[in-house]
Amino acid sequence: MRAVDIIIKKRDKEQLTAEEIEFFVRGFTNGDIPDYQASAFAMAVMLNGMTPFETADLTLAMARSGQVLDLSEVVDIAVDKHSSGGVGDKTSVSVMPMVAACGLPVGKMSGRGLGFSGGTLDKLESIPGYRVDLTTDEFKKQLKEKGIVLTGQSLDLAPADGKMYALRDVTGTVPSTPLIASSIMCKKIAAGAQAIVLDVKTGLGAFMETLNEARELAELMVDIGRLAGRKTVALLSDMNQPLGNAVGNALEVIEAIDMLRGGGPADFREHCLHVAAHVLLLGKRAQDLEEARALAEKSITDGSALEKFRVLVAAQGGDVSYVDDLSKFERAKYVEVVNAPRGGFISQVHARSVGEAAVLLGAGRARKGDSVDHAVGFVIHKKVGDRVEEGQPLFEIHANEEAKLAEARLAVHSAHQFSNEIVLPLPLFYE
């Protein structure tokens, strides 16, 4: 078997066998197949696509390229959730303790932010001492003893995916739906997930801007899960405007903790309840979605979700006093409230523009390896459909560099659009 024959076969729109895909992935991972052939393969897939069977075979081959966690001796059913990323998406920080508080152990390996999309690890590191570098043995031990883990991905898991993503990033093949789907799912399978809830974002602040693109990705990932023997459910959620009010690292963790206390923005709370309910249902903690949602709500009202978050922070070396006293979080040097220039109804809060402005302030990364400023970001006071009067607070800027205030103010100001007519709120979920 030769790599060039596999490339030619995909170039000519033929279907690859599982053996051919396994050969290519294994060869690329161990260095027998050079980058230039892997780049040609990625472009052939980008242009000609893959069947769900091929994509499932690619996913499993990438998952098997490194260590595959077996959590069967640790938990009855290993559940995981994945968000395709967006602006203000701090869902995992709240949903994981909600689910764990309902008696369903959850272990999740999350990523860092890149570009306008924030990352869960960056948010959690705004709690001093919080470790995101657990070994796989520490991951298993904490999951068994505490019932909750939220850490970074082990280097031993799916190394083929890391190599392939680095190539895709510089060869114009990032937007390939089969390559996106296999990249997401291989990491979940390698991390031992048996049941997976996918929160696929669509809109101005999502990587899949149109509903059709998001639906195509969601359906393909569900197909991969089914073919790989994993129970998989996909939700399609809105990312035209930031989720919740806070955009930044510490600001988002504060909002997530506030939600666990029973407060927080209504849209963020509703989003978390819906996602948590699906995780609980897939994890067999409820008979139907209504019962699952009631369990999730109870975890907030009885304080058990907040307590589970304390357990998580303590287990991973974080300072638990920050959970109890939100004023301890690092604050930006400059906090400026920007008022509405006119009255009317909010018709748009462009999520990507807000996310890019947060990167400008230092909340995110322009390049992999950049450090982040945990204190900076924005608090959005008015969302799509809200009425605002001239002079009312529209948003807050939290900045540590005075020189960046004007540009950030202009960017987020421009992200807001107004209408004289009544505007309906955006849906939280489409499907």
Put a short name on every predicted segment:
Residues M109, L143, T151-S154, D199-G203, ...:
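Short beta-strand segments
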Residues K144-A193:
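Phosphate/diphosphate-binding glycine-rich loops and adjacent basic-rich segments that engage nucleotide
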Residues A3-V4, T120, D161-D169, V200-T202:
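Gly-rich Lys/Arg/Thr-decorated short loops/hinges at beta-loop-alpha junctions or inter-strand turns
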